[in-house]
Amino acid sequence: MKQTITHNKPRRAISYIRFSTPKQEHGFSLARQLQGTRDFCRRHNLVLDETLTIKDLGKSGFNGKNADSGNLSVFLDAIRNKKIPQNTVLVVEALDRLTRNNVIDASHLLTDILRHGIDVGLVTENKIYSKEYINNNPFEFIVATTYLIRGGDESRV
């Protein structure tokens, strides 16, 4: 009997790190997010491409500037132009690192990323959102939406 050996090639991961104020650069936010991403990638057998770490340091996610004119916007253009392979995982500490915009724009950002075949890994939740996962588990989208609402609400306070 012939035995077939399959190799599961680890998926590529790209880290997105953001904090809102330049003052936070002198704290532990950057180091915490980087270490969390590395640990997450180890747990999920992802290969972290540290040459493509996306950073919006001192850029608020509240009004969407990070997605409109920050380094996140460069990533979004790259996925729309198919320069980032599908099945890549964008790893963020939490959804509020990705955006703190209003819920409509925030959910649009998340679904835009997923629709382009890029999965979103959440360090704090230890889960990976994919288009397939969300479609098969629609209540997870409701959970994600509550995180997006909370992130926006925290910025408005």
Label the model's feature ranges.
Residues 1-157:
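Short, structured surface patches at the beginning of a domain
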